[in-house]
A protein has these predicted regions:
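Conserved acidic
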Residues: 3, 7-8, 24-27, 47
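Aliphatic-rich helix starts adjacent to a transmembrane/signal segment
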Residues: 18-32
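Hydrophobic alpha-helical segments, especially transmembrane helices
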Residues: 9, 21-23, 41, 185
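N-terminal single-pass transmembrane signal-anchor helix
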Residues: 1-20
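Short, well-structured segments within or immediately adjacent to enzyme catalytic domains
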Residues: 28-264
Length: 264
């Protein structure tokens, strides 16, 4: 009898695991669609201006238009990790989408310990740095000459359906509100490609969620193992504070193609 139960468990458990993964993927897509709709509603009520991906380097007056404030890590003393009143509820998108659950992928199980209790972190999503930039300005420490989109009408190339806005970021590389797609190597020098601090999440079987300016969302399966380095729960990635060469990485190329274009 015990042997029969063991055999049945061996047959059923993988199927249950796949069903759970599929359900999480569906919820992830729904979260992205809801938050992207809030992003579009904000723009439509702000004379077409989109929110900033991160704070400006010196002008704090722009902070109210930053999509989310605060830097995440695994320190329980850092309230931005676990207190939504400091970040999520202060987001300019909150009034259009007043739900805490949509900010976090259901596959993200990262926590911080606060006075002996494990609390979930408030978000897993980040915004493309090329959608809004640093208070509307371009990044200064990466290859210059790439367009920062500041309004919906700016997104003519690659176009709304081909420009990703939100992405689920790996828990060990999650930091400020933007996701930094380094455009180095695009389109004709793939041997110089690299990650700049940020890595996409792969919570859905080597795949992660994204949403695009036209409102649709996708689960993208990553194909290069370098996009998915070993993760130690509760610890910052050693890649988080450095540029990491990743020549001819098809995942970087995919993100670059859907991030921005050269300024003209």
């Amino acid at each position: 009898m015990i042997a029969i139960v063991a055999i049945l468990a061996g047959l059923l458990l993988p199927g249950l695991g796949r069903a759970k993964q599929k359900a999480q993927g569906i919820q992830c897509l729904n979260n992205h669609r809801q938050l992207l709709l809030a992003w579009r509603m904000y723009a439509e009520e702000s004379r077409d201006r989109i929110p900033y991906a991160s704070v400006h380097g010196s002008d704090r007056s722009r902070d109210s238009a930053v999509w989310v404030l605060g830097q995440l890590d695994f320190d329980g003393a850092n309230r931005f990790n676990w207190d939504p009143n400091l970040s999520v509820r202060k987001s300019p998108l909150w009034k259009y989408c007043p739900s805490l659950t949509v900010w976090r992928c259901p596959g993200d199980r990262s926590t911080v310990t606060v006075t002996g209790r494990k609390l979930p972190r408030v978000r897993s999503m980040t915004m493309s740095v090329w959608a809004g930039g640093y208070g509307g300005e371009a990044p200064q420490d990466l290859d210059s000459g790439w367009r920062v989109y500041r309004s919906l009408v700016d997104m003519q190339d690659p176009g709304p359906s081909g420009t990703w806005i939100l992405i689920d970021q790996r828990e060990d590389s999650l930091n400020i509100g933007n996701f930094y797609t380094d455009m180095r190597g695009y389109p004709d020098a793939p041997e110089t490609m690299r990650f700049a601090y940020d890595y996409p999440a792969s919570y859905h079987g080597r795949a992660g969620g994204l949403s695009f300016a036209d409102g649709h969302s996708e689960i993208r399966r990553w194909v290069d193992p370098r996009t998915m380095p070993t993760l130690t729960p509760g610890q910052r990635s050693r890649f988080n504070a450095e540029f990491t060469p990743s020549p001819r990485n098809a995942d970087i190329r995919w993100l670059q193609e859907r991030a921005t274009r050269r300024t003209r």
